[in-house]
């Protein structure tokens, strides 16, 4: 069961439990049911409760620890304030917004919450392009809150730059074949930007995404290693999704940059469940409070995310003569070998735990006198302990 926390939060708990009841707990040849759940945010409360109900003495295998994100990711926040940045009033090519305020009196002379909410939507379209230009991004993943927001941003980038901002969308309203094709186009570098909802934040392994080909620019900014980028147009309302989003760019061999555009004022947005038939284009609304969401993310990750000015320039900060930006990556070692060497002891410990658990199972079989049934006369059972040791040695060798 992959992305277990997501399935449970979407209301599939009863379905999982019904399936679990129908699956034989032990087969006629003596094989017992093994239940494995996986996720980058495995320590969710829902997963722990399910483990208590369905598993016997569950073992938690975690290479990084609870609430962990790649050390090779820098989190950067740009606050979008329509009070101090009035450029939204004179935009020549504004982004087409979600239509939430189509029937509201939004005008610069009307200093209402609705006006500033609309202003934020317009500014975020501009800030996205500014981030791309400022960092000379050739490839990046851009996350939007809804499918409609993705479509609007795709149209906006195409109108503003054509090939310069070539992009494709990845969300639930696109047909499966189109989604597959768009993802492959992005991987093959036929387009520069992948615009997606959180559906793309889980389970996708997209590696090798240097966001700038300008090596001179990189060297001038003291970044002499490949860089990866994610732009969050809107923060996710589920803090665990932030971990999945930025996980696209933090890799053992490369440094990642996560830029989040956070509104300083409440933003009125469409709010829908899985059942909604309007596909995110009308219906109920809520007021989105991104500063609160940012605080939840920082608390969840136990960090303070650096804030940058509206120019989206990520400075090289000095403290006691040491470079801060990129320091985490430099301390770790930028090569894959350094990363593997760090994980080696943890992987060995996990392998030992697996060996102990499998050995305990074999001992329990012996205590139950299952030899009488001829189950352990089969070499694959009789030599189970040695077989497990052999397999784990191979696993450890392949990992480290």
Swiss-Prot record:
Gene3D superfamilies assigned to the protein according to its UniProt record, in alphabetical order: P-loop containing nucleotide triphosphate hydrolases
Sorted UniProt keywords: ATP-binding, Exonuclease, Helicase, Hydrolase, Nuclease, Nucleotide-binding, RNA-binding
Catalysis: reaction(s): ATP + H2O = ADP + phosphate + H(+)
Short motif (DEAD box): ranges: 2-5
Xref: CDD domains: SF2_C_DEAD (cd18787)
Top-rank lineage group of the source organism: Eukaryota
PROSITE patterns: HELICASE_ATP_BIND_1 (PS51192), HELICASE_CTER (PS51194)
Helicase C-terminal domain segment(s): 115-316
Any GO molecular function: ATP binding
An example Gene Ontology biological process: tRNA processing
EC number: 3.6.4.13
Annotated ranges, domain Helicase ATP-binding: 1-60
SMART domains given in the database record: HELICc
GO cellular component, one term: nucleus
UniProt-listed SUPFAM superfamilies: P-loop containing nucleoside triphosphate hydrolases
Enzyme's top EC category: hydrolase
PANTHER family, per the entry: RNA HELICASE
Function: Acts as an ATP-dependent RNA helicase, able to unwind both RNA-RNA and RNA-DNA duplexes. Possesses 5' single-stranded RNA overhang nuclease activity.
Membership in a protein family: Belongs to the DEAD box helicase family. DDX1 subfamily.
Protein's name according to its UniProt entry: ATP-dependent RNA helicase Ddx1
Organism: Drosophila virilis
Gene name, Swiss-Prot/TrEMBL: Ddx1
């Amino acid at each position: 069961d992959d992305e277990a926390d997501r399935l449970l939060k979407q209301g599939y708990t009863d379905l999982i439990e019904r399936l679990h009841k129908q699956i034989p707990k032990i087969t006629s040849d003596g094989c017992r049911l093994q239940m494995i759940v996986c996720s980058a945010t495995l320590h969710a409360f829902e997963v722990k409760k399910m483990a208590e109900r369905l598993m016997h003495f569950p073992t938690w295998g975690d290479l990084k620890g609870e609430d962990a994100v790649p050390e090779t990711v820098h989190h950067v926040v740009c606050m979008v304030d329509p009070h101090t940045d009035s450029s939204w009033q004179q935009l020549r090519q504004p982004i087409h917004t979600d239509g939430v305020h189509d029937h509201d009196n939004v005008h610069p002379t009307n200093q209402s919450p609705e006006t500033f909410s609309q202003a934020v939507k317009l500014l975020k379209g501009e800030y996205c392009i500014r981030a791309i230009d400022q960092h000379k991004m050739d490839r990046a993943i851009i996350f939007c809150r809804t499918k409609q927001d993705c479509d609007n941003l795709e149209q906006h980038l195409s109108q503003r730059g054509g090939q310069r901002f070539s992009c494709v969308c990845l969300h639930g309203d696109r047909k499966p074949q189109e989604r597959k094709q768009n993802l492959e186009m992005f991987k093959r570098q036929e387009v520069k930007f992948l615009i997606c909802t959180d559906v793309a934040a889980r389970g996708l392994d997209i590696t090798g995404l240097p966001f700038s080909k300008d090596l001179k620019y990189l060297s001038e900014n003291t970044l002499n290693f490949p860089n990866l980028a994610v732009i969050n147009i809107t923060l996710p309302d589920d803090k665990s999704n932030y971990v999945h989003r930025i996980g696209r760019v933090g890799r053992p061999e490369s440094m990642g940059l996560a830029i989040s555009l956070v509104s300083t004022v409440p933003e009125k947005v469409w709010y829908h469940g899985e059942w909604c038939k309007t596909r995110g284009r009308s219906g109920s609304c809520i007021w989105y409070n991104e500063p609160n969401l940012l605080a939840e993310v920082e608390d969840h990750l136990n960090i303070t995310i650096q804030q940058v000015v509206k120019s989206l320039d990520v400075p090289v900060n000095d403290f006691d003569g040491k470079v801060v930006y990129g320091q985490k990556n430099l301390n770790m070692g930028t090569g894959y070998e350094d990363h593997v060497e760090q994980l080696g002891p943890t992987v060995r410990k996990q392998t030992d735990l697996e060996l102990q658990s499998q050995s305990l199972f074999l001992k329990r079989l012996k205590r139950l006198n299952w030899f009488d049934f001829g189950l352990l006369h089969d070499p694959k059972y009789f030599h189970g302990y040695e077989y497990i040791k052999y397999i784990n040695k191979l696993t450890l060798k392949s990992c480290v």
